[in-house]
């Protein structure tokens, strides 16, 4: 079992490179994002290590959805249907990220994870309902 955030981050980065040929970029101006065509995940180093890990797992979830499950490959438009599709993808990416952590033996504080997911999903919910 992995016990520190640096080790967990390093293991997820290695997993993404080995399994999916995805590079992870850590910069202070990066957005937490997965760039599918470029095969890059960006992580903002201004976040705490715990937040960086959680964002990395979430963005890995996007990669798993697109690469392994062949889901959400089309860009969503601004229609209600498109917004709901993006919201579904965001929720599924959090679930896939948690499953990846579990499979890799990365301990996740369930309460902190749930709050972090909720905070991040609220922006998408607000956008989708506007």
Annotate each PLM feature.
Residues 1, 67-70, 129-130:
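Short intrinsically disordered terminal tails
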Residues 2-6, 11-50, 63, 67:
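Active-site scaffold of zinc-dependent metalloenzymes
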Residues 3, 7-8, 48-50, 98-130:
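Long, well-structured alpha-helical subdomains associated
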Residues 33, 66-98:
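Post-HEXXH active-site segment of zinc metalloproteases
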Residues 43-47, 84, 104:
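Short N-terminal micro-motifs specific to bacterial/archaeal maturation
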Residues 50-51, 82:
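Alpha-helical hydrophobic/aromatic positions enriched in membrane-embedded helices and signal peptides
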Residues 51-59:
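Short alpha-helical catalytic segment bearing the HExxH-like zincin motif
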Residues 58-62, 90:
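Acidic active-site catalytic centers that drive phospho-/nucleotidyl reactions
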């Amino acid at each position: 079992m992995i016990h520190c955030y640096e080790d967990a981050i390093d293991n997820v980065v290695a997993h993404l490179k080995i399994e999916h040929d995805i590079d992870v970029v850590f910069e202070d101006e990066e957005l937490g994002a997965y760039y599918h065509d470029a095969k890059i995940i960006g992580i903002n180093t201004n976040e705490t290590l715990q937040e960086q890990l959680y964002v990395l797992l979430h963005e890995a979830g996007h990669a798993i959805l697109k690469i392994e499950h062949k889901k959400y490959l089309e860009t969503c438009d601004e229609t209600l249907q498109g917004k709901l599709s993006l919201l579904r993808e965001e929720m599924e990416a959090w679930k896939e990220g948690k499953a990846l952590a579990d499979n890799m033996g990365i301990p996740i504080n369930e309460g902190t994870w749930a709050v972090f997911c909720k905070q991040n999903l609220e922006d998408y919910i607000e956008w989708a309902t506007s």
